[in-house]
Amino acid sequence: MKKEISGIPIREKIEKNLTNEIENLKEKEIVPKLATIRVGADSGQIFYEKAITKRSEKYGISCDNFIFEEGIMENEVEGLIIRLNEDENIHGIIILMPLPRYIDQKKLSNMINPDKDIDAITDVSYSKLLSAEDKGNTFFACTAEACMEILYNSSEEVKGKKVTIFGRSLRVGKPLALMMMNDNATITVCHTKTKEEDAILAAKNADIVVLATGNTGGYDRRYFRDGQIVIDVGTGKGKDGKIAGDLDLEDVLSAGIDISYTPVPGGVGAVTTTLLLRNVVKAAKMKFPR
C-alpha cells in the first residue's frame, strides 16, 4: 500500500530539544540570529525564505532577510557577506538558491565565514563531510541531512540499500551521496547528462529514490516500481500554481504503483527548515560555549 511519509512529526521531535536550547541561550542574554540572502524572485527561493522567517519567529530566533533584485552587481552581494561575517550578532548566513547565472555561486558561497556556514556550502564544510569528520562543530547541508533524518525516523536502514539520487547539487545531491556512502549504501547519481533510459533503469533498480532536480512533476510511472521509498526534495510550481515536488504522484498512483513517499509541502522541507535553525543555535553555542 502507498504510504505518505510526513516530515512534520520529525520536525516536532527536533523542535522539543531546540526550544530548550534557545531558552538556555536567552537566559545568558544571547539571541540566535541568522541572515538570509536572496537574489531574484525564484518561487523556490521565496517559499524557503518564508518558511525560514515563519519558523524563526515561532522559535524566537532573530532573522534578517536581505533581498536583491536580479541584475544587482555581484560586488554588492559580496559586500553584504563581508559585513555579515563581521557582525558579531549574526550567527548564521544562508544564500538562497538558485542564484542568477551571471553570479559566481562558488565564489560567493566560499566568502561565508565557515563558523557561520549553517547550510554547509563552503569548501571547508564540504571537506569535513568528505573526511567524515564531526567533532561537534561541523555543519551539514540541511536538505541532505533532512533526507537522512526522514529515513532514520521511518526506521529505514540505509546500510546495504541501493539508492538512486537525481541531482548533483552542492546543497543536496553531492552531500547526500557522501552521507549515504558513509552509512554503507550503494549509490547511483543521475544528472542532466544521464541518458533517460539509463536514469529510468537506475531508478527502478533502487530501494530508495531521491528526487532533487527541481524538475517539477518530471518523474512519472516509468521511474518506479512497488515497494520503493521516494524522497521528494523538489519545490516548484505545479500546473495549478501551487507548490509541488519533482514526483508526478498522480501518475504514479494512477498506475497502481505502491510506493512510500514524502509529500510536498510537508515532507523534506518541513525538516530542512528546522535543521537550519538548529544549526543557527549550534553556531551561537559555539561562539559562546559557556
Where are these regions (language model features)?
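Short beta-strand segments enriched in small/hydrophobic residues
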Residues: 31-40
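Short beta-strand segments
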Residues: 38, 94-98, 212
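Glycine-rich phosphate/diphosphate-binding loop of Rossmann-like nucleotide-binding domains
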Residues: 39-53, 137-229, 233, 238, ...
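Short beta-strand elements in bilobed, periplasmic/extracellular small-molecule ligand-binding domains
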Residues: 56-70, 187-190
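Rossmann-fold NAD(P)-binding glycine/threonine-rich loop
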Residues: 106-117, 126-127, 234-288
